[in-house]
């Protein structure tokens, strides 16, 4: 009897590993249900589960989720409204929840309102201040103070010649003042500044180290002004500033009104070549470039005085050439 009772326990113990390793176990099917719903292609809130996935543990999971969705959510939930777009980026700003009429007052919205008011209050205070907000953020207001052009005397207080100038005075921009050279090098400096434009007039100081130069155009005067601080002759540093001496400008204007024909004659020409009156045409020794074209299209034909010798083509000349080899 004891041996008969022990025999059936052997196969019972041996059958346990076969039951644990059986491929027909429903556990892999239960584990498959724990994957996220968006990976399985299921809807966010399915009404009825699929027939093949119904089992005991899966029903328990659904029963555990249902109380959370039913009882734990507020009457107008905010999060489930965007449940269908959980994988997409946000489509509204964080400030839209405050002004949207469909959403109720939540602790999140009540917590955001004082923060936004604090953030906006400094900006409102800055913009409400008269003059400060516009001058900081308006490009047009930045250039408004610069519309009033200051005279050179106001820009540089060390100018003593500009004491008689007022803000209504209009100075000629074609005049420049060159200074910083010795008296012996005045002609050399004048010759150097003649390379930057046509000098109409120059007024040199008898005792000082400056001279006033008037150019033909304002562009030439600006080119001369760009040479401020340049060293000439490796020992002379020259300064160039806009001329503010009204007496020099007025005297040149009076001379131009009295003799208009001489106003356009550059005085710099008197250094090398003599000046000619404006009515007399200038005679140039250079050969015109159109001379060769005019010669080719001339109506006249050149005829030589004597006849050019030609070869005799007669029969006698051919016979003599054949016989004697001429």
From Swiss-Prot:
Functions as a component of the nuclear pore complex (NPC). NPC components, collectively referred to as nucleoporins (NUPs), can play the role of both NPC structural components and of docking or interaction partners for transiently associated nuclear transport factors. May play a role in the association of MAD1 with the NPC. The gene is NUP35. One of its GO terms (biological process) is nucleocytoplasmic transport. Belongs to the Nup35 family. CDD domains: RRM_Nup53 (cd12722). This is Nucleoporin NUP35. GO terms for molecular function: identical protein binding; nucleic acid binding; phospholipid binding; structural constituent of nuclear pore. Keywords: Membrane, mRNA transport, Nuclear pore complex, Nucleus, Phosphoprotein, Protein transport, Translocation, Transport. Residues 170-250 form the RRM Nup35-type domain.
